[in-house]
A protein has these predicted regions:
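Switch II of P-loop NTPase G domains
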Residues: 1-39, 43-66, 119-131, 156-159
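Conserved ASCE/P-loop NTPase catalytic core
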Residues: 4-22, 30, 63-70, 74-107
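A short, ordered amphipathic alpha-helix with a cationic face
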Residues: 51-52, 73, 152-153
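C-terminal-of-GTPase-core extension/linker across diverse P-loop GTPases
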Residues: 83-175
Length: 175
């Protein structure tokens, strides 16, 4: 059987999506089903193409998306903590699970992505993977550049360089 990659184009996410703004809840439900996220980031200026925030700033745009994903993950963790805590009094494994869930939640509340959570071992990594957190998923950034920056792979584009630096610091790739 040949390998298949299916891309699902999901409408852009806006600030407040985790609270239902725009198509937020639908977007977050759709993205939860994917194995990896390809985040298209605007890295060009054109006065004919209006930016929702009024200016081009790819790091701000990445941060907006990441915060919405973090907020959604925190909500998922809060529900899981509430559900699991009920049985944790009589079950040491559930108590340990609650402890891990609370630690991940605290990590997210500091503005960190779940994938940067320091796992103790493979079992803990597998448990976190089973939570299907959005900020645990691998991310590839697609730098959307104008035609002038295609030949040099964006090397002369300062926006692309900022995205590359961010990606390198966050275990992600850019193309």
């Amino acid at each position: 059987t040949p390998a298949v990659i299916e891309f699902v184009d999901i409408a852009g996410l806006v600030k407040g999506a985790s609270k239902g703004e725009g198509l937020g809840n639908q977007f977050l439900a759709n993205i939860r089903e994917v194995d990896a996220i390809v985040h298209v980031v605007r890295c060009f200026e054109d006065p004919n193409v209006i930016h929702v925030d009024g200016s081009v700033d790819p790091l701000r745009d990445i941060e907006t998306i990441n915060l919405e994903l973090i907020f959604s993950d925190i909500e998922i963790l809060e529900r899981r903590i509430a559900k699991t805590s009920k049985g944790a009094f009589n079950d040491k494994s559930l108590a340990k699970e609650v402890e891990i869930l609370k630690a991940i939640k605290a990590h997210l509340e500091e503005g960190n992505l779940a994938k940067s959570f320091p796992c103790e071992d493979d079992d803990q990594r597998a448990f976190i993977n089973s939570l299907n957190l959005l900020t645990w998923k691998p991310v590839i950034f697609a730098a959307n550049v104008n035609e002038d920056h295609l030949e040099d792979d964006g090397a002369s584009n300062p926006y692309v360089q900022k995205v590359r630096e961010f990606a390198a610091a966050n275990d992600s790739q850019v193309f």
